[in-house]
């Protein structure tokens, strides 16, 4: 049995979010939360909220034991990019890409034995 949580259209670059999500993939819940709490990145607080949501979904919707959970899947997909312009010299304009992410975390119970 597995429970998942998804955060869509998060205003953080997918590349930067993947750096953080790679740290917790395959880890137990307690260890993953500890890693996220001590990672000095903007994406770590967002990913921590998604992980807590996945834990709550597992506990409340699927009657899973929190002590037996681990992060079975964790991935970041690219969302839509907001395009903004910055005025440059001699009448030109520079393009600024504000990237967004879709963050998905799936937690599962460890198999006994």
Curated annotation (Swiss-Prot):
Keyword flag Ribosomal protein: yes
UniProt-listed CDD domains: Ribosomal_L22
Pfam family, one: Ribosomal_L22
Coiled coil: none
GO MF term set: rRNA binding; structural constituent of ribosome
PROSITE patterns: RIBOSOMAL_L22
Keyword flag RNA-binding: yes
Gene Ontology terms describing biological process: translation
InterPro entries: Ribosomal_uL22, Ribosomal_uL22_bac/chlpt-type, Ribosomal_uL22_bac/org-type, Ribosomal_uL22_CS, Ribosomal_uL22_sf
TM stretches of this protein: none
Task performed by this protein: This protein binds specifically to 23S rRNA; its binding is stimulated by other ribosomal proteins, e.g. L4, L17, and L20. It is important during the early stages of 50S assembly. It makes multiple contacts with different domains of the 23S rRNA in the assembled 50S subunit and ribosome. The globular domain of the protein is located near the polypeptide exit tunnel on the outside of the subunit, while an extended beta-hairpin is found that lines the wall of the exit tunnel in the center of the 70S ribosome.
Stated family: Belongs to the universal ribosomal protein uL22 family.
NCBIfam families recorded: rplV_bact
HAMAP family registered for this protein in UniProt: Ribosomal_uL22_B
Oligomeric and partner information: Part of the 50S ribosomal subunit.
Protein name: Large ribosomal subunit protein uL22
Organism: Halothermothrix orenii (strain H 168 / OCM 544 / DSM 9562)
